[in-house]
């Protein structure tokens, strides 16, 4: 590899390098301790020094230096891992550079020319290290990474750090390498080499820890084993990168269906340290300000913002994206605001001395920022973006335009269902209504002071108002604002209407499920007892299923959406659902509910941290995880009365999942005494259900007909709990839980949850497969990992399946015989044979059952498998393999199912007499396969002779049979000789590889189908030898002769695949088996015990090399 020229004093390197070649301008050197003297003490010391100092010489012990006769300074220009590699660079220099250097007069000119040439060569290589901070050093690290770990060429190194890896109480100083798919570590200390390579998708725990021995370290759990890395200079940065890489690996490998192709990091080759940092920053920015997924953080400025309601300047950061100007305080005031750039009217620079700028908004509002370091650049950025976003398409400011939009969607409900079924009565002087008006007045005062809409200041006072309860009339507006759904709706005008038009009249599984659950959504509420509410709910759910078919429709979405429709317009409810499913509760609403399971694990962790008394009493907290599932999926709507649940939803839209976790802790804390008295889970469930029935909302203005009456509503002995008090207590006791902390816990537990699900799936699969094979449990476990890694992109809960190319690769890695010329065709035939349902995929059970025959079964079973591999498949004249009709995926009735089940049982008890006969082309292919399998064996010569004897014997037997048949009296067509007859049914779908002898196959198939010829000649022994290129003799026939009745057999009969022409010869499996049993060498070969563990170990080593 060419290197950027760097100075080196040769006199300081004489003790570590040995000169191999030299001329007037260049020196080729070898590192001491490598090559001839690598085994001595010098090799140990130099190797240790190279590892500790991160020297390139560890993996590139050869180098080329540039020198000039009049200078003592040398320049490194190339390095190599082997003498052959460095010699190529040396030869290139000799042929292209040395002759040219003689024309220069001074040494400086020579050095300048050489350096320029080397830099040009490096630029031509175009390596991916150009984006890194130190390209040359990163190029060297990439070289070490590739040489040390032998991973696929497409594997991309992201970053690397110096650290110590702890084995027991002994630290091993080395380097950790983080690539797109692997965590690697290498250390070499005084001859003790430590090398670790772990895929990210096998990491189940990743967290920062500290102990007495280790001040601070990173703990990585892989396959149940903990690994500790410490003494990292930038531990937090390293941990965040490792966390991101593990998360992306989980998403790519186990959740590919939700990993969008347009994702910025969908291509692993685009993942760099800088890309990871940018992506993490964008995610954090969007999550904090609840902005659409299209927004990316462009610029950040520190500044002071004048806050009019408190009359102070608050310190914070200005964040600018494509369409928004955001500010978040850093002084603990919890103040933040979001300004859409299309709302900006102008930008002024009133005071350059204080580096201030004023942003004027529509509606006669202004924001004054001061002490902005680069205020002129910020002003120019805002002006430029406002110029491109000045179009009114982003918001509706014209009342006429609004009327047009409403008129275009007459079918869409433009009123919240609560306003339709329970309109606000201004003359109602009920105490609850009076309190509701007081709440409205408090919010109006807040709006007047802090602003209203997207430009509102959000502060501690805003949260206080949320905790006390949101007025019914403002609930929809505030949900849209705090969830960020308002930004999505403004950015996509008319999107919901177009979705409804696109999905109108469509039918799908999601639509069927939606129809089934429509009448189960708040059935006690009048809005969903009429067509108005049911139709609106159907439209919103159907539109979302059409927008996001990867999620489609999941249970609990109907309950949540019905509550949204009560307080928001139909289009607003749609965008609220989008915000919940895609941003606020990611991975919740799919068939695996991974997001809910992750939050269950987070909840369990918080219980251990905050409710220690409960954890001491109940060591197994899985009960609370299972009970809380409905809490998270429905935001407590399914367990609380609707009038109380909406207060919880208020807090959720403001604080996210943090509010739900806090409330869950408060519920358990409130019932602590009763839970400690429970003896089993059933009692605990009863305690919690009774508590939820006692929760009320004394301030709710909803009429009694709407409120859900609990079973204990009239029970005076049960103490009532007001939802506002419960929420207030949750914020007071557990409000210190930060959103950032919850997100980190989510990431940490996501690895554990997915690996737990994967392990459960694996155990279930292995339990089923183990009943039919003779592999040990550990061997099955290793084979499962090999099988899984050949298709890591499938969702983890799906049964792993391989297509033909993947199967062939894995089959060739695991077959017990040495690689031979027929490996590819044999693997192809095995794939079609094992694909019992004809779907073009082989699952783990099918694969293991086939492998079990090759590894653990008797000589007869192995030979039978080889025999079946060489039978012709069910194929049409075009050569396309087609599935048998009975193996289709169509629905069948009970009788048909029982018939198929009986046939499967019969297939398991398959008798060798039921196997079809093998014709001449297939037999020749089988013989050649045997020759290839025997190649390289210690008894190769005797095995070859045995096959030749068996072939000759079978041919003589067939010839004698033909002669006896010819000399017998003429028979009717119904008594055609048995050589062309087939059994009535074939229990196994026969398959065959492509012919390895195209000339033979072509000449055979080109013949016209003919009856038995009286002049047929049997092939000679030379026709079947492994080196033979000729094909067996075939009969000649007259076109006027009539065909045999065998050829008139319908093509859909089971015997048709192996029907042969009457002029060809064929053998039964019994004949071949009987002949080979007389050859001890062949029997010994197939009865030889297979070292399964060795083959699996070899396959694991070679799998990565063949992965790409």
From Swiss-Prot:
Residues 822-857 form the EF-hand domain. The record marks 516 as: Arginine finger. SUPFAM superfamilies: EF-hand, Ypt/Rab-GAP domain of gyp1p. Residues 1010-1024 have a biased composition (Polar residues). Its main location: cytoplasm. GO terms for biological process: glomerular filtration; vesicle-mediated transport. Residues 469-656 form the Rab-GAP TBC domain. One of its GO terms (molecular function) is calcium ion binding. Residues 967-998, 1025-1057 have a biased composition (Low complexity). GO terms for cellular component: cytosol. It holds the Pfam family RabGAP-TBC. Residues 961-1059 are annotated as: Disordered. Disruption phenotype: Morpholino knockdown of the protein causes pericardial edema, retracted glomerulus in an enlarged Bowman's capsule and glomerular permeability defects. Ca(2+) binds at residues 835, 837, 839, 846. Residues 143-210, 283-351 form the GRAM domain. InterPro entries: EF-hand-dom_pair, EF_Hand_1_Ca_BS, EF_hand_dom, GRAM, PH-like_dom_sf, Rab-GAP-TBC_dom, Rab-GAP_TBC_sf, TBC1D8B_PH-GRAM1. It is found in: Cytoplasm, Cytosol. Involved in vesicular recycling, probably as a GTPase-activating protein for Rab family protein(s). The arginine and glutamine fingers are critical for the GTPase-activating mechanism, they pull out Rab's 'switch 2' glutamine and insert in Rab's active site. This is TBC1 domain family member 8B. The lineage of its organism: Eukaryota, Metazoa, Chordata, Craniata, Vertebrata.
